[in-house]
Amino acid sequence: MQKEYVEVNEGILGSFLGEDVYTMNGNMIVPSDTIITDYILKKLIEFKIYKIFIYKTDPIYGEEFIKNEKISEDQKRYIEDINTVKVMIQDLASGKELDFSKAEDVSEHIYSRINDCVSLMECVNSVRIADEYTYSHLVNVSVYSMLLAKWMGLSKSQIKEVILAGLLHDVGKSRIPHEILNKKGPLDEKEFEEMKKHAVYGYEIIKNNKDISMSVKRAVIMHHEKENGTGYPYGIKGSHKNLYSKIVTAADIFDAITSERVYRGRQTPFTAFKELENIGFDTIDPKVLMIMFTKMPNYYIGAKVKMENGEIGEVVYVPNQCAYAPVVEVNGNFYDFTIDKEVLIKEFL
């Protein structure tokens, strides 16, 4: 997208920053791609930032994007993509071959929104159905993988392959018994051992497809391998994983935490960021994780949230060094989660 250099004033509210903004001392104030809210505008003025780059955007962006009619159409297409994936997985479960054209169609649609990620993320955040997790998870991981690949500077062809890897990473679950996939509670040891086979099953499903690159195939079989070598199916270390698998691993874990499951409710993205920090570099590649922490929180600025005490607020800022601790405005008062550690967000609205 094109950028323009503009003065810092109320006219830029709702716009997206076109580059990282730093203080005179070289400390980042706000990262690129952040939506400019009242809180962020005040922060820019406070640090005497007089001009910045913003993206030239079409009307679906900015402070009014949620109200735009295009969002409802996006949601319809997102649900259509989930249904397409559902048919693809159910066909596999019934013994049919992979219908690669379905995977291609969904992947191409997701890629077509690469410069319209705000509305795409709105779809991911607003449509969450526990019973459809197996199918929506594949679409969501594709979206998150695309974002990570984009932020890491991958080429168009590489980004498309990463999307496909995200979409196919769990196709092996089509061979896992339904009662294990949808068990309302933790798996026992035997069930977990069966569940772990899905990575190999997935590879077996796609290994002879000449339209799928080896990089994508490796991502499918390696997405549960950990950086420290304690993952599965082979227990290899991060140095032996390819970049696609590293990206899909991060996207997979993030969506699993933030999705509605049959055995627990969905967690907020900020809870997910905290869990990812706890998991750390033993599981996820450092570069991928740091990109996620730097860029992804920006998509939740402006989100309406319900606090544990029942108050309704809005996320107005996320510190660059503390992705799990946003600033939330409630009736003109600000909760800074780096300070107000007793205050918790219950859910996104």
Predicted features and spans:
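Membrane-cytosol interface segments
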Residues: 1-101, 333-337, 342-345
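Histidine- and acidic-residue-rich, metal-dependent catalytic cores
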Residues: 82-349
